[in-house]
Amino acid sequence: MINPISFRPGPVTFWTTLIYLALLIPIVIINEEPPAAPKTAEPFKGVNLTEAWLDLTTITRAYHPYNSKFNEEVRRYLLEKVESILEENGATWVFDDQMAAAAKDGKSAAVTVFDDNVSNSTFVMGKSNGTTFTRTESINNAAYFEGTNILVYIRGKEDDDGDWWEADYVHGMRRNAKGLTLVNAHYDSVSTGFGATDDGMGVVTCLQVLKYFTTPGNQPQRGIVVMLNNGEEDWLYGARALGQHKLNPFIHTFLNVEGAGAGGRAIVFRATDREVMAAYARTSHPFGTVIASDAFGMGFISSGTDYSVLVDAYGQRGIDLAFFKPRARYHTNQDDTRHASKESLWHILSASIHTTKQLSGDTGNTFIGQRPDKAHGKVANGRPSNGVWFDLFGKSFVLFGLRGMFAWSLTLLIATPLILVGITWLLRNLDKDYFFTSTVKTKEHPEYEAVPIGGWKGFFRWAMMVSIFYFSFWMIMRGANFVRPSALHRGYANLWLFVFGWIVLVAVTALEDRRRIAAGYIFVFLESAIFLSCLISFVELLALPRKSAYALQVQEDYDGHDHSGYQGYRDSTDGLSSGARAESSASAGSPSSPTVAQEPSKPTAPAGTTNGLSTAPSVAAHSSQPQPAPATPTPGRSTSAPIPSTTPRDEDESEDDDDEATERTPLVGGNGTNDRGRTTFATTYRRSITALVHGARKMEEDGEPYEHEQDWSGHLPSWAWFFQFLLLGPFMIILAAQTGLMLTDAVYQTGSDGSKLFTPYLMIFFFTLLLILPLTPFIHRVTHHIPVFLLVVFIVTLTYNLIAFPFSANNRYKAFFGQYIDVATGENKVCYTGIEEYVRPIIAELPSASGRDVTCGKSLRRGSTIATCCFDGSAVPPKLGSEDLDGLPQDNYADIITVNATRSHKKGDSSRTTARIEITADNTKSCFLQFKKPVSALTIESGSGWDDRFGQYPEDGVGLVRLWHREFDKTWVVNAEWKGSETRKGDDENDGTVICMWSDANTPGTIPALDEALQFVPSWAAVTKFSEGLVEGRKAFKIV
C-alpha cells in the first residue's frame, strides 16, 4: 500500500492541489461577495436596516454636489431625519443656539444638534498648474470655504454636564478630559454620480449610529459626535471647516465612513495606530490589511479622504473605513442604489456601530495624555503605538504591535542562521552532512576511489526559477529532476528560499525600525515558515547512514559484484577450459585484476597461466557473502577510474603487462595465439564505482530511493515533505491570495484615472510569485496534468486578453468631461480627458462633434499617458444663468460674471499695492480667482483668518484662490496685496482672471453637452467630471 503522504508524484499532486483549491475558492468568494444581510429589518435594538436603505434611496435620487440645488434639499432632509430619530427614541435634545434656555431648567440635554452655517476656513492648498482654461506654471493655491456641516453631540455617561465646550465654561481647566469620538461621513456627491456608496451609505450609517446610541439603554460611556459634512468631493472642504467648530478640540478619536468604489465589502483603508484597530478587530466580518495603510503613507495611493485632514491637521486618531471597488462605477451614474446592495450597507453599518461602541467605551488612558510629538494646535490624545493587522477569510482579525514584529524579525535574522549552522555542525560530526558533499572516501581504504554521494545535485536549480510561475516552475524543475535526479532538491529549494527570504527580511526589518512600515509582515511570516521547513530538511538527514558507512557498503558491494560476476560467468562457459574460464573471470574486473577494457593484455602469458590464459585468483574469502545483481549505469553519470590493485598477484600481472603490444595483441585482452576464448567485449568490461553505486540499493530493506535519485535517499522519511508544505503553504496562500486580490481590485482600473499602468501588473506579478512560492520545493514531484492544464488556461486567456476589447458595459472606461466658455468672447469648447486611443472613439459618437476638428494635447492634471481632446462646443451651449429662457439656448454669457477690481495703496508705504476685488456670479456657489502675479497677502471679507494647521502662507505668494459660498449668487470680496515697486494705471502686471463653476446637471438641458454624452457614448464608456465644475466660465479683469 502506498503511503498517502509519501513524497511521490501522486500524493504530492493530490495534496498540493487540494490545499490550494480548498483555500483559493473561499478566498475568491469572500473577496467578491459581502456577508449576507440579516433577514430581519431590526437585527438588534436601535438599528433598522430597512429604514437605512430607504434613506439611501431618498438622498441619491439626483446628483447632489455642493454646488447644486439638490444638495440643499439633501441637507434639509438630513436635519429632519435627525429630529425624527431623536423624537422617536424619546431623547432630550436641543439645537446649540437653545442651550442657554435649556440650562435654566437645570438639566443637560442628552443630545445637542449643531446646524453649522457659521464655520468657514481660509487655508493654503499646495501647488497646481491653474485651471483647465488658465494653464500656467506651477503656482501656490489657497481656498476660502463656507461650511454647512451638521453635527450631533451625544452626551456620554462620563461627560461633563452642561455646554462644557463653550470657552467661558471653566477658565483654566481642561473640560471633558476623556475626549469625544467622531463618526464622520459626507453628504455631497460628485456632479456626475448619485453617491450611493460615495458617500450615501456612510451618511445613512451615521444616521443609524445616531439612532443606536440614542436608543434607551445604549448611551455611550464617552461622548460621540456624529458629523454629516458637506464639500468633501472637491478638496475635503467639510473636514477643513470642522477645524473652526467649538467641538473639534475635544475630539480624540474618529471613524471616517467613506466610499472609493461602488459596493462590495468595506475595507479598513488606513488607521493611525494599533489601539484604534483594537476597537475594530472584533467586528463580525473584519476586512483589511496594514499594507493598504502603509501604501497611503508611502504615497503609492494618492486618493484623499477626510482622514487626511483629521489626522494631519488636527492630530486625531482613527480609522478610514471605505468601499474600494469596483472603480469603474466610482464617480459615475452607476454609483446608485441599483448597483449597490443591502449586504454592502450591512457590512459597513455593523462594523461602524461596533467600532464606535469600542472607541467611545474606552474609559482608560488609551486616548488621553501628552502627545509624543508635542505638536502645538493638535489634540492631546495619548501615545499611539504602531500596529500590524490583517484579516483571515473576512471572519477573524490578526492584530499585534510593530515593535513585537521588529523583535521577531531581528530574532529571525540573527538566530535562524546560527541554528542552521549548528545543525550543520552536528550533521558533520555525525558524518551525515549530505548537503554540499559530492564524494566521500572510506577511512578503511583511503586508496580506493571516492564514492559519489551526489550531495550538490539540486543546489543551483531553484535560483533560476524566481521570476516564473507554476508551469514554468514545474517544466524546468521536472526536467532537471529527470536529467539529474536528486533527493536533496527539496532541501536545497528550502535553503534557497531561506537565503533569499533572509535578504528580504533585512530590508523589511530596517523599514520596521526606521520608517515604521508594517507592510512587510508577510515576509516575516514567510521567513519563519521557511526556516522551520529548512530545519526539517536538515534534521531529516539524521535518518541517513553515515557517509563513511555508505561508502564502505558501496565498496563491499563493488567487491562482491566482481566475484559473483565471475561465478556467474564460470557457470555459463561450459565449452571452455578451466583456464579460459579463469581468464574470463579475470577479465571481468575483479579487485585483483587490471581493467582490460582500458588496457589490453600482453601476448606473453605470465606465470600462473595455462595455455596462455590467466589463472583465476581465489575467491573463497568473498563467496559466502550475498551480493546484488549489477545495475545499469544511469545516463548522465560519469564513469570513474578503477580501484587500484593491492595484491601481489596484481603486481606480477602489472609487471607482465608492461610488455610492449604488437600487431598480434588482441584488442580486448588475451594473446595472439588463443583469442577465441573471448566471448564478447561486455564480458571483459570493467565496471566503475559510479555504476556500482546503484548496487547499494538493497543494502537496507527499509526504503527504496525514488526512481534514479541517490541510492542512500531511500532512508529519508517520505512523509517529511507533507509537514514542510503545511508550514509553507496554507498560511502563506491565505495571506498572498486575499491580499493580492484585494489590492488588485483596488488599483487595476486606476489606469484611466492617470495612474501608472505598470503598478497593477507589478502587483499581480508580486503576489502571484508569493502564491506559488510555497510550492517550489515540491513542484518537481507534481504530475504533468496540472501544469499542462494551466498551460492551456494560460494560452486561452492570453489569446482572449489580446483579442478582446478591454472594456464592457459592466466594466466601463471612464472619460473625464468638461466644458469651457470665455464669457466675454463666447468661445465654447467641450473637452474629454483620458487615454487618446479610447477618447477619440467616444467623441466620434457625439452628434455635436460631427464634422468638427478634434485637437488633443497632454493633460496637465493627470498622468503622462492621459490626453485632453477638445472640439468646438457651440452646438451645445449650456444654460448657466438663473433666468428661465423658455427652453432656448443661452447665447450671451457676458453678464453672468461681474468683476470689480480697484487699486489702492497702504498709507505711508508706496512700495505695496493693494486691490479690492468684488466677484458676483449668477447661479453658482464657486468661483476661482487667478492672478498674473502672485499676491503676497490675501484676506476674504467676512472670512476667518488663515488656518496655519494647513500650512503657512507661502513666501512666494499665492497665484490662485478658490472661493466657495454656502449660498447662491452671493458676492465675494477679496483684498489682495503685492510687494514691489508701485505700478501705474494701465499696467497689467497685477491683473487676473475669474473662473466660475457650474455643476448642477439634474435638470435636462442645463448642460446639453453632458446630456448628449450620457445618451450617445458607447456602452463601454462612462463619463465623469474632470474638475470642480462641469462647466467653467472665465472672465479676465484689470485693476483700475
From Swiss-Prot:
It comes from the Eukaryota. Binds 2 Zn(2+) ions per subunit. Disulfide bonds: none annotated. It is an enzyme of class 3 (hydrolase). The keyword Glycoprotein applies. The chain crosses the membrane at residues 10-30, 406-426, 437-456, 463-483, 491-511, 522-542, 716-736, 759-779, 786-806. Glycans are attached at residues 48, 117, 120, 129, 900. InterPro entries: Fxna-like_M28_dom, M28_fam, Peptidase_M28, PFF1_C, PFF1_TM. Residues 1-9, 427-436, 484-490, 543-715, 780-785 are cytoplasmic. SUPFAM superfamilies: Zn-dependent exopeptidases (SSF53187). Residues 577-594, 616-626 have a biased composition (Low complexity). GO terms for biological process: proteolysis. It is found in: Vacuole membrane. Zn(2+) 1 binds at residues 186, 198, 258. Its EC number is 3.4.-.-. Its main location: membrane. GO terms for molecular function: metal ion binding; metalloexopeptidase activity. Zn(2+) 2 binds at residues 198, 233, 331. One of its GO terms (cellular component) is vacuolar membrane. Residues 636-647 have a biased composition (Polar residues). Residues 31-405, 457-462, 512-521, 737-758, 807-1040 are vacuolar. Its cofactor is Zn(2+). This is Vacuolar membrane protease. It comes from Sordaria macrospora (strain ATCC MYA-333 / DSM 997 / K(L3346) / K-hell). The lineage of its organism: Eukaryota, Fungi, Dikarya, Ascomycota, Pezizomycotina.
